[in-house]
Amino acid sequence: MINLSRLITGVLVSVLALAAARCPAAESPGHAADGGRERVSLQEAFRRPPDAVKPWAYWWWIKGNVDEASITHDLEAMKRKGFAGLLMFDARGYHEDHVPPPPSRMDFMSPEWRRMLRFAMTEADRLGLQMSVNLSSCAGALKGPWEVGDDAPKKLIWTSAEVQGPKCLQCELAREGEDRRWDVALLAARHDGQAGAKTSAGAAASEAVSLSDAWQDVQDKPTSKSPVVEVVDISGKVDANGRLTWDVPEGRWTLVRFACVIMEGHEYDVDILHEKAVEAYFERMGKALLDDAGPLAGKTLTHFYSVSWEGAAPTWSLGFERQFERYRGYAPQAYLPVLAGMTVESPGVSDRFLRDYHKTLGDCFMNHCYGKLRELCNRAGLKWHSESGGPWNRKIPDFQHADQLAFLGRNDMPQGEFWYPTRGLNRPPAMAAHVYGRPLAATESFTHMRQHWCAYPAAIKPDADAAFCDGVNHFIWHTFSASPPEFGKPGIEYFAGTHVNPNVTWFEQAGPLLAYLARCQLMLRQGRFAADVCCYTGDKPYLHWGRGEKWNANPTLVLGKGYAYDLVNTEVLLERTSVQDGDLVLPDGMRYRVLVVDLEDETVPPRAMRRIVELAEAGATIVLGQRRPTRAPGLRDYPTCDEEVVRLAKRLWGPEGAKAGRRSLGQGKIIVGTEIDDALQAKGIPRDFEGPWHYIHRRLGDGDVYFVAGSGQAECTFRTSGKEPELWDPATGAIRDAVWYRATDDGRTVVPIRLPENGSTFVVFRRPAEPRHVVSVVGPEEGVETASQMEIERRSDAGAQLRLWRKGPYVLETSGGERVAFEAAAPPEPIALAGPWEVRFAPEWGGPESITFDTLTPWNEHPNDGVRYYSGTAGYRTKFALDAAQASGLVRLALGQVGQVAEVRVNGRALGVVWTAPWTVDLTGRVKPGENELEIDVTNVWVNRLIGDSRLPPEKRLTKSNVRLFRETDKYRRFQGFSPKDALMPSGLIGPVRLEFGSRQEARF
């Protein structure tokens, strides 16, 4: 494996300034290979992406349905198509009602299962693939195929009874350990003289007291109106035989007994709040897999993994009260009645305790599960990656006050996810990677929650581009399912995902898409993310599905387009920030020009407020939102903590009612009541990017890499100057000088760019600008549209080599003020290739062996059922004649509409796969005067064949899969198969297909 680690760490920064420099490539998700291996230039790595920057795939074992032959077949296919690694995942019992899986072939972690996994590791090693394994028998939880006894997750329960004092109370309690119940506390809560709530047992005060039955789950918030004015811990009044003896003082008291029990139905799950339980689980499963890997651990088996959290949400754990005191600074027992619905002291105090309780649940989950697993993996020579609780349901107690960034920061490789189409959760893991110094931000890619096999390369590309712009740089494609031959085609599948295994019709054409992803990942691992702003929103930063347009649910400030930001949390603010030259900097090199404090609510920890003041005094510029903090969270040091927050808020925001404006604090600047964009521009920081498209910017030591994605033509402005822009096309690997650009008065560079539909490009600034370049072009059609008429192919010794597709006058103006005018001759007229076309289908998939299309017709509209319901590859063949003038100039083949990918050959020469716009192929130098033969193999998706088969009895169907339609009214209809009522997808070569001609012209300047 080529060692790519130094590109990530920034050693390559100086390399990028030199076009001919040699350099190592970017870090792979696993461990770096031997540094003595071959080094490649960045340009060469871009043209031919090395393994270390290629994407991975989720490799699903559907209930252990694999064998040695299928394992070898799958892994060889991954390697051949351009995957560099795999995440092995055998999940059982997860949404099996959506798409029922086949029967289990072998039990999870059984000797045969482990033998298959060992074989997979050796095959991956043979092929040079890296491997991660999901450390669970289930998706969405941490569990194995065995009951874990007392290590299972627990919930807090309570029961209560009312007594009236004074009196001597004696009663029998069921002893701890009965029914696997652990006592937590026995408390007596005195009310303020008003009638108390009814007891859970329904007993009156004069009746016998029972505290051993009628258990209830804890409550989310207090329901009683009368506050508890005193809480007494009477746990010590219970003797070894479970007999309570207590002299009840005067007053109305509620006795509340708290205990924890294992959550019903979760006897196989692990208590994620308990460090020892998690460690025992790792020792049982992780250690076994490490033993099986032997010398491949850390070499081929590089990671363990956990997916999004959808498992048990425990509300207590053994020893939780000690962890509470450790994290919150006080013992919780006096406030536990709040969890039984009582108000202790006041509603405000009760709310603060609830916040502390939920925060502690999150901290235990974060540190004792994810943090511990990372520690254990690292100790074993592996890395840990997970989605750290995503997709982050704030209704779950463990996540209500959790710090999303800190959760993700407990990974060696933070991971998010995005769904096709247009649903993403990529910004949080990218931000966590930036602020915690992790070089890679991963994403579960292309998860699909609709009917299967509808997706194809051109359709999913926009979502990939959006994820890249959101900051992730390592794709793990979801999903590549293991499906041995006996399951037929399309075969067995998991209920969700964009499928990409060899049973997928377009799998053999997937290589260029995977190379595209690899090139993007290579470039987005260079240098560091460029963001002008870091934003602190409070003690529980959180972003849900979306692009991070808002940094909290209630923003008072908005960052304008063309500026980028990262969230920072309290942990990073306290432990990783410093000020250099007025910028906020992190130990790993991230640098922000401005700290924004835009709070989600009025609650801030005093230590965070102190740190913000310290940063300002050290020289930072801080922009404050309208929401002024008034209190601290929780009960630590209450009420003096609130007083400190108010005092520090006054130092930052000024006195109540103070006017907006700018003022100094120490060496720094405080800005209140001003838009962030205005504050940045006042510091001489113009927008980083201006244009109609999505973008991301990576800053190098002496250069810049921008990725832009969108459709159409535009003049784009980049905040860099004195550098020659280059356009690096990730779809083809082509690199060319832009040549046409101009400098602005505010130190930026404007580059006209033309993108096809859902197109993208990298704009790289690394070399000093040439003394002469083109600053404007006027063609037959004025304005930036000229980019569609003229392409600057490359620089030449005399100026620039142009490709022209329109006749007429062109005028180029250079940076030296020179005007270069010329008249382009009319190119030959385009040739329409309407037909006839000979088309060959695969009879084994229901198509005619050969048929003639007089004109191009979508397969789904053809009268022949064998064509209309066909899925797979069909070969088109036609001939065309060119004269000498046509054959000697520029020639391109425009395919028009394609459903869904095409491979082109001219005169027997393969010209590659066409999978995305502009759906053209360069034929220059590949055609000849006279007759030429054109062959186009077109591949569609499985949909039409599956719809056709749904019309047939099972024994006559050509396809076979566990994904089938059960009932039209089934609530899981969208996850299932097809019916005759479903619409066919446009398929085949739809066109119009034509040959277009142009000419070359050298512009001298």
Where are these regions (language model features)?
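Bacterial N-terminal signal peptides
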Residues: 9-19
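Boundary at the C-terminal end of the N-terminal hydrophobic targeting segment
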Residues: 20, 25-27, 32
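Mature N-terminal segment immediately following signal peptide/propeptide cleavage
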Residues: 38-85
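Carbohydrate-binding surfaces of carbohydrate-active enzymes
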Residues: 56, 72, 85-86, 105-139, ...
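Acidic/aromatic-lined carbohydrate-recognition and catalytic surfaces
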Residues: 91-234, 258, 266
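Short acidic/polar inter-strand loop motif in beta-rich domains
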Residues: 263, 770, 816-820, 939-948
